[in-house]
Amino acid sequence: MYQKLDTLKDGDILVLAGSIPNTLPEDVYEKIMERLQGRKIQIVVDATKDLLLNVLKYHPFLIKPNNHELGEMFGVELKNNEEIIEYGKKLQEKGARNVLISMAGDGAILITEKGDVHISPCPKGEVKNSVGAGDSMVAGFLTGYLKNGDYEEALKMGIATGSASAFSEDLATKEKIMELYEQL
């Protein structure tokens, strides 16, 4: 695995997502980020509690907790956008550059490294399968960001992609993603 990581080049993006298999050490995300430190590789982390908190010292480009995971990290129940933003900023204080907080049917909040806060609702639709919607949101966010470095564009594309995934029985189509994007 480390040999593959060593082939990453400046400008590449690495997404670390999900739980860690029992066959790997619990600190594998930390070891990966430590190994890549100092290189110009954008790292995205979509993981829960300690897996996420323990990598913040390596300043990941983007982290994506949901609002429930965010509250769990700090032992609080987050009741509104103001509280979600407050605790999202605490993750930045710990080292995250950009924090994307998904809120299921309530949309998402993005707190950028520039200090901007973007809040976007979720498009209307019937949830058919939410498995993978968070992963789709990350992929959409990166697609939008890579277009021109615009965080607001990235947030809209992330929400459209995650929503299209949740509103589909199988994989979302580009047509459905763009239809939802236009609603935002």
Features from the language model and the residues they span:
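Conserved phosphate-binding/catalytic loop of the ribokinase/pfkB sugar-kinase fold
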Residues: 1-10
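Structural motif
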Residues: 12-13, 98
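Conserved beta-alpha-beta core of the PfkB/ribokinase-like small-molecule kinase fold
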Residues: 13-83
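Conserved phosphate-binding/catalytic region of the ribokinase-like
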Residues: 34-35, 53, 81-184
